[in-house]
Amino acid sequence: MKKILPLVIIAPLLISCSSSKNKAENEAYIKDTNGFDILMGQFAHNIENLWGLNEVLIAGPKDYVKYTDQYETRSHINFDAGTITVETIAGDNPSAHLRQAIISTLLMGNDPGTIDLYSDADYIPISKEPFLYGQVLDNNGEPIRWEWHAAHFADYLLQTRLQTRTTGLRQIWSITIQLVPNHLDKRAHKYLGMVRKASQQYGVDQSLILAIMQTESSFNPYAVSHADALGLMQVVQHSAGRDVFKMKGKWGQPSRSYLFDPENNIDTGTAYLAMLQNSYLGGIVNPTSRRYAVITAYNGGAGSVLRVFSRDQNRAFQIINGMPPDQVYQTLSTQHPSAESRRYLYKVNNLQKNYRR
């Protein structure tokens, strides 16, 4: 009894500590979420007050949007469309405001942690290796690296491409710049080394990582979402981020700055794919069927994938393992309750085929 007694005494303490830990984590998550919602609400309100309701534009997974000049000027990179649009409502010398915004956007660096997309802070650090280098060419077909070069191109754009439009009582001055046709490939190339490293470390196919990165962010390291998913692989701190930290023996969850670092983001996103592949959905025997399930789960969660087949987890695995892969794909792409997850499987699966070629 003497050896058992301490365990009996300690067990309730362990349960209590675990319960307290979970409670603290839940409270921290609620606090973070509420804080983010308040921040976003105030941010959108500030924009609406100046630009009007129909002109509210906020950064997203495939849209870089940065406000400056007390919210009167903004730069928008649409990574899907391959365009940069710089706009201002500043009535006092709008060309000067546009010129500075064009220069700052063309020369901004690769570190998303240095730029606050949820404020009107004017500071945008200029990099020796701009993020957009090679993705934008000047009027002579040359890539832009230096400040004098960006300034000359900005002057050319202001002389030849300045446009105006009216919204409500506001006049908006704008410049639109096209990215090069293969801008997506140029961004993807920046991260191939990181993808190879994560692929080898976690045993996840490179083509799957790249397909998910393209689907989630179009290789935009500044990617954010309304759900506060962050970075290239759109990792959510309190779910996938927390799961990966726990798997690595780390306390808590990754910070925003941690996930905005491209290498950390790719590592965390790939580690989560490995957890889906080897743990949460490891009961699926056929690798192709498991891949379909992993893709869908990265978007909508492993639990929702299994519930498509049965509410009982073991039974769900049995049903999936009794199906050919094509039937698993058909079931997930037509019967998953989330239309977004159904589209996600279709898109990632097709993109992965391209990356395998």
Curated annotation (Swiss-Prot):
Pfam families for this protein: Mltc_N, SLT
Functional note: Murein-degrading enzyme. May play a role in recycling of muropeptides during cell elongation and/or cell division.
Lipid-modified residues, S-diacylglycerol cysteine kind: C17
PANTHER family membership: MEMBRANE-BOUND LYTIC MUREIN TRANSGLYCOSYLASE C, SOLUBLE LYTIC MUREIN TRANSGLYCOSYLASE-RELATED
Known catalytic reactions: Exolytic cleavage of the (1->4)-beta-glycosidic linkage between N-acetylmuramic acid (MurNAc) and N-acetylglucosamine (GlcNAc) residues in peptidoglycan, from either the reducing or the non-reducing ends of the peptidoglycan chains, with concomitant formation of a 1,6-anhydrobond in the MurNAc residue
Molecular function GO labels: hydrolase activity, acting on glycosyl bonds; peptidoglycan lytic transglycosylase activity
Record's protein name: Membrane-bound lytic murein transglycosylase C
Primary localization class, coarse: membrane
Keyword ATP-binding: no
Membrane topology listed for this record: Lipid-anchor
GO cellular component term, pick one: cell outer membrane
Biological processes per GO annotation: cell wall macromolecule catabolic process; cell wall organization; peptidoglycan metabolic process
Keywords: Cell outer membrane, Cell wall biogenesis/degradation, Lipoprotein, Lyase, Membrane, Palmitate, Signal
Family named by the database record: Belongs to the transglycosylase Slt family.
Keyword Hydrolase among UniProt keywords: no
Signal peptide: 1-16
EC numbers, comma separated: 4.2.2.n1
SUPFAM superfamilies xrefs: Lysozyme-like
Upper taxonomic lineage: Bacteria, Pseudomonadati, Pseudomonadota, Gammaproteobacteria, Enterobacterales
Gene name of the encoded protein: mltC
Residues covalently joined to lipid (N-palmitoyl cysteine): C17
